[in-house]
């Protein structure tokens, strides 16, 4: 048996208010249409649902049975409609993002602040991952998308879009101030202690290749887990390190560290968005992605 859900919806409100006129008012309809719909419902179900009187209606046993089943469904559907409406207008919702430390520090945090100011009802879940881990999280469907720093290896089915280029600088503690006036070579850096991220990181791979291309070998004396840790170690005079210029800027301006200069040009890196274009995003995630890619181009 097929019965139009609209009839059940009208039945729910008539039974709830025990009055055709009140139900019509709530539904934005008129009493004759409501009465006609309920007559059709009774005809299709082949039973009497209401006892009509001048004061309104009361439910028959069959009506009571139907209402006991319909009420919870009607409330859940109404809640779902309200939630979808709130989601569509960005009053509520959630976004899950995997981000690398560099991407979060020099790009994503500012975008998140602007988005959260405009849409405070959207919940944000940010996961801190390395670039390979972030890409894998997108592939596994664990996050809506990832914001990473290059280099990155992207598998088939995923798309990568450049959001912002950035460059890195070589910095050292104040004991290396005398070197700041020189133009060093990568080979000469072998004479000084170096601080780097772990051997498994894409940043380490990036600099390993950079050194090799100039007939030099990258041999760090100290490994750190994060760029923030590297900066702390640099300030503690443990060695030299390559760090994103935006992350070193404040410390350089305060004179806590010094910038050293290389003869070789450090290749530019990029902050990129990675997403699965086969997987649809919810309204909030789609809106934030549009904000990020307003002036993008492929990496």
Regions found by a protein language model. Give the residues of each.
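Short helix-boundary/capping micro-motifs
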Residues: 14-30
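A late-sequence structural motif
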Residues: 107, 258-299
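Alpha-helical linker/hinge and terminal dimerization helices associated
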Residues: 44-45, 66-88
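Hydrophobic hinge/microswitch elements
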Residues: 130-135, 139-142, 149, 208-259
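A short LG(V/I)-centered, amphipathic sequence patch enriched
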Residues: 42-61
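Flexible hinge/capping segments at coil-to-helix
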Residues: 157-195
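Central regulatory/effector-binding core of bacterial HTH transcription factors
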Residues: 92-154, 224
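Secondary-structure junction motif
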Residues: 193-214, 281-285, 289, 299
């Amino acid at each position: 048996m097929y019965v139009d859900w609209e009839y059940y919806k009208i039945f729910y409100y008539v039974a709830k208010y025990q009055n055709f006129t009140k139900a019509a008012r709530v539904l934005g309809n008129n009493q004759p249409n409501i009465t006609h719909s309920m007559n059709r419902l009774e005809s299709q179900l082949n039973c009497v649902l209401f006892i009509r009187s001048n004061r309104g209606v009361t439910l028959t046993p069959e009506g009571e049975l139907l209402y006991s089943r319909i009420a919870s469904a009607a409330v859940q559907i109404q809640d779902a409609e309200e939630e979808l409406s709130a989601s569509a207008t960005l009053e509520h919702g959630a976004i899950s993002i995997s981000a690398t430390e560099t991407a979060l520090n020099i790009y994503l945090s500012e975008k998140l602040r602007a988005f959260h100011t405009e849409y405070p009802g959207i919940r944000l879940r940010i996961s801190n991952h390395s670039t390979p881990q972030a890409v894998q999280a997108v592939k596994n469907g664990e996050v809506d998308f990832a914001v990473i720093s290059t280099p990155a290896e992207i598998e088939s089915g995923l798309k990568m879009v450049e959001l912002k280029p950035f460059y890195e600088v070589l910095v050292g503690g104040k004991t290396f101030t005398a070197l700041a006036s020189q133009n060093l070579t990568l080979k000469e850096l072998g004479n000084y202690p170096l601080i780097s991220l772990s051997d498994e990181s894409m940043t380490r791979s990036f600099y390993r290749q950079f050194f090799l291309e100039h007939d030099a070998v990258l041999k760090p004396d100290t490994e750190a887990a994060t760029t923030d840790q590297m900066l702390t170690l640099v300030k503690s005079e443990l060695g030299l390190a390559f760090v994103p210029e935006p992350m070193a800027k404040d410390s350089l301006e305060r004179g806590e560290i010094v910038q050293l200069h290389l003869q070789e040009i450090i290749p530019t890196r990029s902050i990129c968005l990675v997403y699965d274009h086969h997987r649809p995003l919810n309204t909030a995630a789609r809106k934030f992605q549009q904000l990020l890619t307003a002036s993008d181009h492929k990496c």
